[in-house]
């Protein structure tokens, strides 16, 4: 567990210039608490102790403002930065080294009527490794966001996203087709890197 925690905290320090130390990240970053509590609630969920798992996830929501369903599958080093309002639905799957900014929703699109027929189906998105999702973005339905894709702030993604795509707008469109911006760094907040 010590190695896991060190790798996790190091990954946050690499991605967040405001992160100063392992201790400060551990004590003051709500996304870290939410991920740790999700690991616990997910383990309990897999033991089929569903109510206890939901109680732990609700405690995490109360403490952090981040809602992660205990059944969601999350890989290594998920960084939820400024996490207030993040929602990760029940059948969501998240790969390794994914970054989510505040108010991101990984949600379903199925209507709440006839929920019995939807109960065992995939309803939420899958984010592959190294995906970055900007603040306020909504990724909805059982779609796949492939590796290294970037989703801009407030984008609404309703269709599968190819590898290395840069998605912006409502509905989101890929602006990285045909390597139009291959040398430019993605800016989830729209701020230029190095004041260029």
Where are the regions that the model predicts?
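Terminal amphipathic alpha-helical/low-complexity segments used for targeting or macromolecular assembly
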Residues: 1-64, 179-196
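Extended, non-globular alpha-helical segments
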Residues: 52, 56, 99, 105, ...
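Short gly/ser/thr-rich secondary-structure transition/capping motifs
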Residues: 58-68, 112-117
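Solvent-exposed, flexible loop/coil residues
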Residues: 31, 36-39, 72, 78, ...
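Left-handed beta-helix
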Residues: 64, 69-70, 75-76, 81-90, ...
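Residues at secondary-structure transition points
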Residues: 31, 47, 69, 89, ...
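C-terminal segments of enzyme domains that contribute to small-molecule binding surfaces
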Residues: 117-140, 144, 170-196
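Conserved short-loop catalytic and cofactor-binding motifs
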Residues: 24, 28, 62, 86, ...
């Amino acid at each position: 567990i010590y190695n896991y925690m060190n790798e996790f905290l190091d990954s946050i320090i690499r991605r967040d210039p405001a992160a100063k130390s392992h201790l400060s990240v551990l004590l003051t970053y709500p996304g870290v608490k939410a991920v740790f509590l999700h690991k616990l609630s997910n383990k309990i969920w897999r033991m089929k102790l569903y109510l206890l798992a939901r109680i732990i996830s609700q405690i995490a929501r109360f403490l952090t403002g981040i809602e992660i369903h205990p059944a969601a599958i999350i890989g290594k080093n998920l960084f939820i930065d400024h996490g207030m309002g993040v929602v990760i639905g029940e059948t969501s799957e998240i790969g390794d080294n994914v970054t989510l900014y505040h108010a991101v929703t990984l949600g379903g699109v199925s209507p709440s009527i006839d929920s019995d027929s939807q109960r065992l189906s995939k309803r939420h998105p899958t984010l592959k490794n190294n995906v970055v999702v900007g603040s306020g973005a909504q990724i909805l339905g059982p779609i796949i966001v492939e590796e290294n894709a970037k989703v801009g702030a407030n984008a609404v993604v309703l269709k599968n996203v190819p590898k290395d795509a840069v998605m912006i707008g409502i509905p989101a469109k890929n602006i990285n087709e045909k390597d139009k911006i291959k040398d430019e760094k993605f800016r989830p907040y729209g701020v230029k890197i190095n004041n260029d």
